[in-house]
A protein has these predicted regions:
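Active-site neighborhood of HAD-like aspartate-dependent phosphohydrolases
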Residues: 1-48, 142, 152
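A short, conserved beta-to-alpha structural element at the edge of catalytic cores
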Residues: 36-42, 148-168
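Substrate-recognition element of Asp-dependent hydrolases with the DxDx(T/V) motif
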Residues: 54-55, 60-94, 101
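Class I S-adenosyl-L-methionine
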Residues: 65-68, 98, 102, 138-141, ...
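Short phosphate-binding/catalytic loops that engage adenosine nucleotides
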Residues: 75-76, 106, 145
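Substrate-recognition "cap/lid" segment bordering the active-site pocket of phosphatases
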Residues: 81-127, 135-137
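Acidic, Mg2+-coordinating phosphoryl-transfer loop and its flanking beta/alpha structural elements
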Residues: 128-160
Length: 172
């Protein structure tokens, strides 16, 4: 099977939303996600343009370098597949994430979906999604795609290299 496209999530894969959120509100976003006061912080986070200036996620540059190599040397398409966290601030978050990518010189196409559950709609048997959220990966896999749960760059690179190497050897 030929891998035709790799989708990269942004938050928790390339950029460090979690750290910035914790620095500002002294809580991790995951602990707040299901509580009503998350929306208070969420509004502030968006209105202060925080997505534009997030730090790199540990290993994010290394992962991006390898994915760029796959794009340039093997013709594998690369796109961002990231969530805006809902309709309320969708346009603002999409713009801020584009600013972040532009500031890092990342020119791949950006797909910003309103909710993470929508990511499964991008699944195909020849596409890979690298994402840090278990239910997103489960849904992507169930929809026929190849999901890599990203927790640490070394493991993600091993899985990605294994899939791509298998793909290259199948062409020989």
């Amino acid at each position: 099977m030929k891998i035709s496209k790799i989708y990269l999530d942004m938050d928790g894969v390339l950029c460090n939303f979690e750290r910035r959120y914790f620095e500002r509100y002294n809580e991790l976003p995951g602990s707040m996600r299901d509580r009503k006061d998350f929306n208070i912080h969420w509004d502030d986070f968006i209105l202060s343009n925080q997505f534009e200036t997030l730090d790199w996620w540990p290993g994010g540059k290394e992962l991006l370098t390898y994915v760029c190599f796959l794009h340039n040397e093997h013709g594998i398409e690369v796109e961002m597949l990231t969530s805006s966290g809902g309709q309320k601030h969708h346009e603002s978050v999409a713009r801020q994430k584009q600013v972040w990518l532009d500031s890092k010189g990342i020119r791949f196409k950006v797909n910003v979906v309103a909710g993470r559950k929508t990511k499964a709609e991008y699944a195909r048997s020849d596409t890979i999604l690298i994402d840090d959220t278990p239910d997103v990966i489960q849904s992507f896999n169930a929809a026929g795609g190849i999901g890599i749960l990203h927790k640490e760059v070394g493991n993600t690179l091993l899985k990605l290299k294994s899939l791509v190497t298998e793909d290259i050897y199948n062409l020989i």
